[in-house]
């Protein structure tokens, strides 16, 4: 065993013990005080690893052999768990503990909150089959696993990207993070495509081929199901074998559309859409609210935990019906609409026009008339005085920014709105800690913090934080 970090370099083999999980899901080990991130490592494992990357302050390694298994280990349900649900080999209770430690570490290390703690952790009741949206990719370049026999056909794949590789796709027949009906659709689609030579997967390198993506959206509370077949050009007749077979063998399908993406960009939405069957949307419910979800609209990916998250926001907001609420980065307006019945007026601010259109539509569907949506680039909107004078100042502000957090001008200006409460919802504890430190410097103090496990078996973390003066 190497005991001095000076000998750690690319290609070196080490015997080390994984101590904890780092933010992002890699195992964390140390040689002396030098940090080694271990791909797919879990706390308590003793492993032989190969260093594949060395930087000034850390190294990354992959496991060659598990020398001693962790007492916290459990058997993964998905064969390919390491793609995007890499924590499946760690017991669920331990996953929550590790995620909580990561949030605490971020607030202590980045925010300087030495006494920071999480007040509550909301675990997930549905630990599998919870994703209401999946995007699978067709490819003529299949990733061949070491465990597969020689001579396996690599000219067709329907599955997911290998982490860090965008040129090859791992063929997947079962993915337990999505509803079971999704796995049935995957199998049928693969079988039909292999039998029909015209249904060739698209190759972004050569710009040749037809099938690009298979997107599935599930209304888990409404039993509705959308299939979106994304193609490289418009040819419904060529799609007929796939369309006919899916509609015949999967009667649960309530919506089928074809997005056409003629661009080289490898994205699962197109310049236009063909409606094939049913409506161009499905419906979903969170609490008493109903939402229409089109192929390309944003919606919380876990309906079950989405309600848990919104209930936490509503609970810590503690509204009495007289408050003016601002929902910043409101997206399609789901939080704003969820709070509306307990507030006097709610104002949602969002820069993306299509999201605002969905928000307006959802307010009409739910017959809510005390929510108002404004197009606003929040990097500059308030600081440059663009807020209309007719809009009253807020009592409560809800902030739910993208992973990058708030723009410095926004986080630095927020206190000037003089709200009594700020509720910060975040999927990134590192940027949240940075922003909360700025709010703290402007007299907003942390009063409550709750972690909601939105995506079990993944490294993703969601937190809801109450700050007040």
Model region roles, listed by residue range:
Residues 217-219:
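Structural signature of eukaryotic scaffold interfaces centered on beta-propeller domains
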Residues 128-132, 223, 459-460:
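A short, glycine/Asx- and small/polar-enriched loop/turn
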Residues 3-17, 23, 234-469:
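Rossmann-like S-adenosyl-L-methionine
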Residues 27-32, 158-162, 228-230:
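Short, acidic/hydrophobic/Gly-rich beta-strand patch recurrent on exposed beta strands
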Residues 1-80, 372-373:
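Terminal RNA-binding accessory module
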Residues 167-210, 233-257:
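Internal alpha/beta scaffold segment
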Residues 64-75, 82-200:
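Extended interfacial segments that mediate partner engagement and assembly in macromolecular machines
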């Amino acid at each position: 065993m190497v005991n001095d970090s000076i000998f750690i370099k690319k290609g070196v083999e080490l015997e080390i013990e994984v101590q904890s999980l780092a933010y992002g899901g890699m195992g964390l080990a140390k040689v002396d005080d030098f940090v080694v991130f271990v791909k797919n490592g879990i706390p308590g494992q003793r492993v032989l690893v190969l260093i594949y990357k060395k930087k000034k302050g850390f190294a990354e390694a992959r496991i060659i052999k598990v020398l001693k298994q962790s007492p916290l280990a459990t058997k993964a349900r998905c064969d390919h768990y390491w793609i995007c649900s890499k924590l499946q080999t760690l017991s669920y209770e331990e996953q929550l503990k590790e995620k909580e430690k990561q949030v605490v570490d971020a607030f202590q290390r980045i925010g300087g909150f030495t006494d920071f703690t999480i007040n509550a952790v909301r675990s997930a009741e549905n630990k599998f089959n919870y994703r209401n949206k999946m995007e699978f990719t067709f490819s003529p370049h299949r990733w061949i696993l070491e465990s597969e026999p020689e001579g396996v056909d690599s000219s067709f794949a329907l599955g997911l990207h290998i982490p860090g590789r965008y040129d090859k796709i791992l063929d997947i027949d079962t993915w337990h993070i999505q509803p079971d009906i999704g796995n049935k659709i995957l199998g049928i689609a693969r079988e039909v495509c292999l039998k029909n030579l015209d249904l060739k997967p698209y190759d972004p390198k050569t710009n040749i081929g037809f099938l690009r993506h298979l997107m599935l959206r599930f209304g888990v509370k409404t039993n509705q199901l959308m299939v979106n077949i994304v193609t490289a050009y418009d040819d419904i007749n060529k799609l007929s074998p796939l369309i006919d077979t899916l509609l015949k063998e999967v009667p649960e399908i309530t919506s089928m559309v074809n997005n056409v993406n003629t661009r080289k960009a490898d994205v699962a939405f197109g310049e236009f859409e063909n409606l094939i069957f049913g409506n161009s949307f499905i419906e979903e419910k969170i609490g008493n609210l109903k939402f229409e979800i089109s192929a390309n609209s944003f919606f919380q990916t876990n309906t079950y935990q989405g309600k848990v998250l919104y209930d936490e926001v509503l609970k810590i907001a503690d509204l009495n019906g007289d408050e003016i609420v601002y929902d910043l980065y409101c997206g399609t307006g789901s939080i704003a609409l969820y709070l509306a019945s307990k507030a006097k007026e709610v104002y949602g601010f969002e820069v993306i026009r299509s999201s605002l259109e969905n928000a307006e539509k959802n307010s009409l569907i739910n017959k809510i008339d005390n929510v108002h949506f404004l197009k606003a680039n929040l990097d500059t909107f308030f600081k440059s005085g663009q807020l209309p004078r007719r809009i009253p100042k807020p009592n409560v502000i809800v902030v739910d920014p993208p992973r990058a957090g708030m723009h410095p001008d926004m986080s630095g200006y927020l206190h000037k709105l003089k709200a009594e409460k700020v509720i910060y919802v975040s999927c990134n504890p590192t940027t949240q800690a940075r922003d909360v430190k700025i709010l703290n410097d402007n007299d907003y103090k942390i009063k409550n913090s709750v972690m909601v496990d939105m995506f079990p078996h993944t490294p993703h973390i969601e937190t809801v934080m109450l700050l007040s003066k």
